[in-house]
Swiss-Prot record:
GO biological process: regulation of pH
Keyword Membrane carried by entry: yes
General function of this protein: Na(+)/H(+) antiporter that extrudes sodium in exchange for external protons.
GO molecular function: sodium:proton antiporter activity
Species name: Anaeromyxobacter sp. (strain Fw109-5)
GO terms for cellular component: plasma membrane
PANTHER family xrefs: NA(+)_H(+) ANTIPORTER NHAA, SODIUM ION/PROTON ANTIPORTER NHAA-RELATED
Biological classification of the source: Bacteria, Pseudomonadati, Myxococcota, Myxococcia, Myxococcales
Protein name: Na(+)/H(+) antiporter NhaA
Subcellular location: Cell inner membrane
Length: 457
């Protein structure tokens, strides 16, 4: 009889912290890559709009499409399909991410949510005030909601490139802040950028919203079922005078965020089922039904919201948002007078994004920390807080979206606003990155929360 082999040491269990952080790591990697794709599409749109192909570029997105179902018919441009149709899916994912953070994520308790909420309020109020200081009393004042948003894809992309100098807690803080920014932007779109409210259609929309709530309470897990009701809600809101993309947000908030069965109970069932399979004769093949049952038990751990986000997020990050950037970032600078490039609308928008976000977020956060309302995320220095506050001034996707609602397509005001959005976002990203680059490296980083580039509202 040979010598007894020593029992290998047991591998320690994965810390709970690592298990919680891994989904956030995946989210951050996805957003970082999406930022690169978004930037490429924005540059391509600007290049096309200022090239000999500018007429073809505009004509392509003005292409008229049509749909007919029996006696019902509709015509719309390709730009409308992107802005009103595909962006509904974008806002659907935004709605789900908001619900996930509020239900099981970083914003699930008041203490966790308080600091990013205060920072977000400052980061929305100060930019709006600066914008109105430049444009009050003019037709451009309608775009006061433009500089309120933070583009999470670009923002996290910049922070990812500087991961050695940004504490992970500060990245989580900025992500939570952007979630509140999204909520603010959604409320602004719903309340201030509608047109001619029609109570009959809004009543129908209310009924469909109640249907979504009932589906959530009944734990409906079919994405197709939610899509069908959301399409009807989109139609009702469109005719009711509220921007139809809000249907995506409402649907996203209705998706169940928790598993129906507790993960512990599911895992216990999986363990028992696996033990039964292992007790079977070794020469007995596992039939497909047994394997399928095991897969179904494992699927019960994931909530419908988690499953839908996992399925749709790559499409939003790498298809819908880049197509939106390609359709909406093109500004023919040759058609604008020099005075318009440095006019009140363009400069007001750029300053509102850069200075407004920087001052609003930094001051509100600093006051909240100094007053003992909440601790500084990761014990970050004032310089690091200044850096991330500046980076949060990158407002792109939702800012362009609100500008389109405020000024309408193809107008000179819209082009001036786009110049301001692009300039303000560029300055915010560059200045924020330079400030963070000059700060000391983070002394100790756990491997779990590391940000690495592997990318959406």
């Amino acid at each position: 009889m040979g010598p007894t082999r020593p029992t290998p040491p047991r591998t320690p269990a994965v810390p709970l912290f690592a298990a919680v952080v891994r989904p956030l790591q995946a989210f951050l990697r996805l957003e970082a890559a999406s930022g690169i794709v978004l930037l490429s599409c924005a540059v391509a749109a600007l290049a096309l709009a200022n090239s000999p192909l500018s007429d073809e570029y505009r004509a392509f997105f003005d292409t008229t499409l049509g749909v007919r179902v029996g006696p019902l018919a509709a015509e719309f441009s390709l730009a409308m399909l992107v802005n009103d149709g595909l962006m509904t899916i974008f806002f659907f994912v935004v709605g789900m991410e908001i619900k996930r953070e509020l239900a099981v994520g970083e914003l699930r308790t008041l203490r966790q949510a308080l600091l990013p909420l205060v920072a977000a309020l400052g980061g929305m109020a100060v930019p709006a005030a600066i914008f109105l200081a430049f444009n009050a009393g003019t037709p451009a004042a309608a775009g006061w909601g433009v500089p309120m948003a933070t583009d999470i894809a670009f923002c996290v992309g910049v922070l990812t490139l500087l991961k050695a100098r940004v504490p992970h807690a500060l990245v989580v803080f900025v992500t939570a802040l952007a979630i509140f920014d999204d909520i603010g932007g959604i409320l602004v779109i719903a309340l201030f950028y509608g047109h001619g409210l029609q109570l009959t259609w809004l009543a129908a929309a209310g009924g469909l919203t109640a249907a979504l709530a009932l589906m959530s309470r009944s734990y409906v897990r079919s994405l197709a079922a939610y899509a069908l009701v959301t399409a009807a809600l989109w139609y009702a809101l469109h005719h009711g005078g509220i921007h139809a993309t809000i249907a995506g947000v409402i649907a996203g908030l209705a998706i169940p965020a928790r598993a129906r069965v507790s993960p512990r109970a599911v895992l216990r069932g999986v363990a028992d089922h696996t033990a039964e399979l292992l007790r079977a004769a070794e020469d007995e093949d596992l039939d497909s039904a047994a394997v399928l049952e095991l897969e179904e038990r494992i699927e019960d751990v994931e909530s419908p919201l988690g499953r839908f986000v996992h399925a749709l997020h790559p499409w939003v990050a790498f298809a819908i948002m880049p197509v939106f950037a390609l359709a909406n970032s093109g500004v023919d600078l040759r058609a604008l007078e020099p005075a318009q490039l440095v006019g009140r609308l363009a400069v007001g928008t750029a300053l509102a994004l850069f200075a407004g976000k920087l001052v609003g977020i930094f001051c509100c956060t600093w006051i909240a920390v100094r007053s003992g309302l909440a601790p500084m995320p990761g014990g970050a220095s004032a310089a690091k807080l200044i850096g991330v506050s500046a980076v949060a001034g990158i407002g792109f996707t939702v800012a362009l979206f609100i500008a389109g609602l405020a000024y309408g397509g193809g107008t000179q005001l819209l082009d001036e606003a786009k110049v301001g959005i692009l300039a303000g976002s560029l300055v915010s990203g560059v200045v924020g990155a330079l400030v963070l680059r000059l700060t000391p490296r983070v002394s100790s980083r756990s491997p779990a929360p590391e940000l690495s580039v592997a990318s959406a509202s």
